[in-house]
Curated annotation (Swiss-Prot):
Keywords: Transferase. This is Uncharacterized protein MJ1051. The keyword Transferase applies. It comes from Methanocaldococcus jannaschii (strain ATCC 43067 / DSM 2661 / JAL-1 / JCM 10045 / NBRC 100440) (Methanococcus jannaschii). SUPFAM superfamilies: Actin-like ATPase domain (SSF53067). Belongs to the NodU/CmcH family. The keyword Transferase applies. One of its GO terms (molecular function) is transferase activity. It comes from the Archaea. InterPro entries: ATPase_NBD (IPR043129), Carbam_trans_C (IPR031730), Carbam_trans_C_sf (IPR038152), Carbtransf_dom (IPR003696), NodU/CmcH_Carbamoyltrnsfr (IPR051338). One of its GO terms (biological process) is biosynthetic process.
Length: 513
């Protein structure tokens, strides 16, 4: 077995046994601090409580360069566990996630803000190996360009880039003609013409594209977001086109934080066979470093349920501890076979239901085990936005039963991890308007039964009742907090958000009418 560790931005840990992922989880879920940095102590302890240290062969670490407290913490853990440690470069760790794809050969593109001195790495994946063919230094970072735009707009860089992407879809001017970063074919590298990154880049961009007003209007933000998104799509596709043509490879594995941009992903998927791992950001480094092991060929995944597991026995104890907070709620145990009907009827009654059961998802998306679900109506979109204190301009995503994607989406593809967007058919827009963005696109989880039988059953029950195989599915967390992890997190977040019902394991907590 290989224990994987990422101790940087969005720290995480994982455990792989031969060709199976046993555990993978982000430290932020345990500490309740978003994008938690540093040694992933709590998630590692969770794993070590499930296996004996003697069963672990070695520890793989994503990322090479570190100093100070990070080195100290890793050394302390190495002394404690007494195992060999292997360190892998940041973008190499990202890139080895190609082993989760079913491509025999692929062009692997890793792009993010930066790690171990690089911000871009292109490789050819063949069998178990990576051959590096192109790279960019930190100063020429595409991810940093987009993060600087995020900061310029008043959002949090390296966290709120999704807001920029969402704003870029709104109606508005798209008239900023400026080349601050580009892909240079002759160099096989991106080139940042600003010559600075971080806050200095934010200041430089502000001087170039913002007038002297103290505050940006919504129209200003849309205009700037369109510039950022257009630039991102153009230069990344330019790089992929160049490398794909040169090496005659049409299979693309896209990793790194920039691969969270689903608009960009869909542009790539229009031209190439695309695989984006569900944990494409730095949280995936722990797994990628472990997958660098030459003895591991491919690992097939059809879900991301690798984290903390909700257990009924523990849920019962927590409910007893918190019973004074639950006087206005009814608590009942629901047999597994009855969950689709019980939860389905609540949804049909236009209730908003929180699901917190089984193993926690790994990666940024909630896919049925730490989700808030409801009918995909505009009314529910507004209701949930208000309760979760989300930005009003951010769209919600749906879960759609895979069997019905052709009825709802234009040119759909299997997308089990919400990594792409698709246009919605005109005759279905009114039916599911709560999960459609202003540009008539949606970012679905296309769900097959073998990925999550009970979640599938809930949506199937709804379809059998009203003919709609779709639910609104958003992550179960309050604004600014990580997705809920354990039983206590789920109850506390449920009570604060004041939703209608919570399915905690097999315990249904619902408001007394």
């Amino acid at each position: 077995m290989i224990l994987g560790i990422c101790d940087g931005h969005n720290a995480s840990s994982s455990l792989i046994k031969r060709d199976e992922i046993l555990f993978a989880m982000s430290e932020e879920r345990f500490t309740r601090k978003k994008n938690q940095r540093g040694f992933p102590e709590k998630s590692v302890d969770y794993i070590l409580n499930k296996v004996k240290p003697d069963e672990i062969n070695y520890v793989s670490v994503g990322g090479v360069f570190r100093r100070g407290e990070r080195i100290k913490k890793l050394k302390e853990f190495q002394n404690r566990i007494n195992k060999k440690f292997l360190y892998f470069y940041h973008h190499i760790s990202h890139s080895y996630l190609f082993k989760l794809s079913d491509f025999k050969e692929a062009l692997v593109i890793s792009i993010d803000g930066g790690g171990d001195g690089l911000s871009f790495l292109a490789s050819i994946a063949n069998k178990n190996n990576l051959e590096i063919i192109a790279q960019s230094d930190l100063i020429d970072s595409v991810g940093d360009f987009y993060a600087s735009i995020t900061e310029l707009l008043g959002f949090k860089p390296m966290e709120d880039e999704g807001k920029v992407m969402s704003l870029s879809s709104y109606e508005g001017e798209d008239d900023i003609n400026l080349t601050t970063i580009d892909y240079i074919k002759e160099l096989k590298s991106f080139k940042n013409y600003l010559g600075v990154i971080g806050y200095e880049a934010t200041k430089a961009l502000k001087k170039l594209i913002v007038s002297d007003k103290s505050q940006l209007s919504f129209e200003d933000k849309v205009r700037i977001s369109k510039f950022a998104q257009r630039t991102l799509e153009n230069i990344v596709l330019k790089a992929i086109d160049d490398l794909s043509n040169e090496y005659n490879i049409d299979n693309i594995v896209f990793v790194g934080g920039v691969a969270q941009n689903v608009k960009l992903n869909s542009k790539i998927a229009e031209k190439y066979n695309l695989f984006v791992p569900p944990f494409m950001g730095d949280e995936g480094l722990c797994l990628g470093a472990s997958l660098a092991d030459k003895r591991i060929d491919r690992i097939n995944i059809n879900n991301t349920y690798f984290g903390y597991e909700i257990e009924n026995e523990r849920a019962e104890k927590i409910l007893e501890e918190l019973k004074n907070k639950l006087n206005d709620y009814k608590i009942e145990f629901v047999e597994e076979r009855d969950i689709p009907e019980v939860i389905g009827n609540l949804i049909l009654d236009n209730k908003v239901v929180c699901l917190s059961r089984g193993k926690m998802e790994f990666g940024p998306r909630a896919l049925g085990n730490r989700s808030v679900i409801a009918l995909p109506t505009k009314e529910n979109k507004e209701k949930i936005n208000k309760k979760l204190k989300r930005s009003w301009f951010m769209p919600f995503a749906p879960t759609i039963l895979y069997d019905f994607i052709d009825d709802y989406l234009i040119n759909p593809r299997y997308s089990p991890f919400m990594t792409q967007i698709f246009k919605v058919k005109e005759n279905k827009i009114k039916e599911i308007e709560g999960v459609i963005h202003v540009d008539k696109t949606t970012r679905p989880q296309t769900l097959k039964k073998d990925s999550n039988k009970t979640f599938y059953g809930i949506i199937r029950y709804i379809y059998d009742s009203i003919g709609i195989p779709v639910v609104l599915n958003t992550s179960f967390n309050l604004h600014g907090e990580p997705i809920v992890c354990n039983e206590k997190d789920a109850i506390n977040s449920f009570l604060k958000a004041d939703f209608d019902a919570l399915l905690l394991g097999n315990y249904l907590i619902s408001k007394v009418k």
